[in-house]
Design a protein with these regions (language model features):
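Active-site metal-binding core of divalent-cation-utilizing nuclease and nuclease-like domains
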Residues: 1-30
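Conserved catalytic cores of phosphodiester-cleaving nucleases, focusing on short active-site segments
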Residues: 17, 32-40, 59
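C-terminal tail/extension regions appended to the core domain(s) of diverse proteins
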Residues: 45-50, 62-70, 80-149
Length: 149
């Protein structure tokens, strides 16, 4: 079962998509959640990584999917190329690792996205991030979807 904007335990933030298993006793168990962002000329593109609505940052802080160890993000590429956005995202991760003033988050260069596979107009990446709040890590799958004309 899929759900839009699943609620988060102990957070007012919501992810965009939740994937659940319905058990025989009607208990719903979340197994994966996804955050989605647009890459375009008019979006605040750095928020894929950090900022008030920062996708990766919310997973790192435990504002998204605190109860899960593996989740994902969708990037809707509406301008430029997937390769350009991949480079920019990794540049923003490096920037945060060298310049972050947020003491509740530790960024490292090891948190850059790594290429996994190309599936037609979708490129798949992976990253792993430290979560200070729970002293563990979260693994993220990243799907960059080419929507350019």
């Amino acid at each position: 079962e899929f759900s839009k904007n699943p609620p988060q335990a102990s957070s007012t933030r919501e992810t965009d998509i939740g994937v659940y298993i319905n058990t025989r006793n009607s208990k719903v168990i979340p197994i994966m959640e996804f955050e989605a962002k647009r890459f375009s000329e008019t979006s605040n593109n750095q928020e894929y990584v950090y900022g008030e609505r920062g996708g990766i940052e919310r997973f790192k802080k435990g504002e998204h999917s605190k109860h899960l160890k593996e989740c994902g993000m969708f990037a809707y590429v509406q301008s430029r190329t997937i390769e350009e956005w991949f480079s920019k995202v990794n540049g923003w991760v490096i920037y945060q690792s060298q310049n972050s003033i947020n003491e509740s988050i530790d960024w490292t260069e090891d948190e850059q996205l790594a290429k996994v596979s190309l599936l037609g107009s979708v490129e798949k990446f992976a990253s792993c991030h430290k979560r200070n709040i729970s002293n563990d890590t979260i693994f993220l799958w990243h799907y960059f979807i080419d929507l350019t004309p």
